[in-house]
Regions:
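N-terminal assembly/interaction segments in proteins that build large macromolecular machines
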Residues: 1-122
């Protein structure tokens, strides 16, 4: 209704709604999750990313798993110094979004607080 049939406006509205839902969950405890790794095909670049959420159920979803792999690949390519720097960076696959925004989008979609807690690149 708010988009009046305009798919671009609808997409922006959905993303804003997801970001708002994610912000409401930021104080929730995150004890589940995984460590994701990425090794470039040449074996000379790699990274580790610890991504956490509230439950094992969400940690096992395709959305969460894909997010972890994408962030690990980003860390290997861009080599941020720390999590704070990572979250502010433009996402390699879509420079119109930051890493923080893609994390919040998945958080809004899953209904759980999702956080990157540590990173390493080599």
């Amino acid at each position: 209704i708010e988009s009046e049939g305009d798919t671009k406006v609808a997409k922006v509205w959905i993303e804003k709604k997801g970001l708002k839902r994610a912000a409401e969950k930021e104080d929730r405890t995150t004890e589940a999750g995984y460590v994701f790794s990425y090794v470039h095909f040449n074996g000379k670049v790699g990274s580790l990313v610890k991504l956490v959420c509230e439950t094992d159920f969400v940690a096992k979803t395709d959305d969460f798993q894909n997010l972890g792999r994408e962030i690990a690949m980003h860390v290997a390519g861009v080599k941020p110094e720390n999590v704070e720097e990572l979250l502010k960076q433009d996402y390699l696959r879509d420079s119109s979004k930051t890493i923080e925004q893609i994390v919040k989008l998945v958080s809004g979609k899953t209904g759980e607080n999702i956080r990157v807690t540590s990173i390493a690149s080599m």
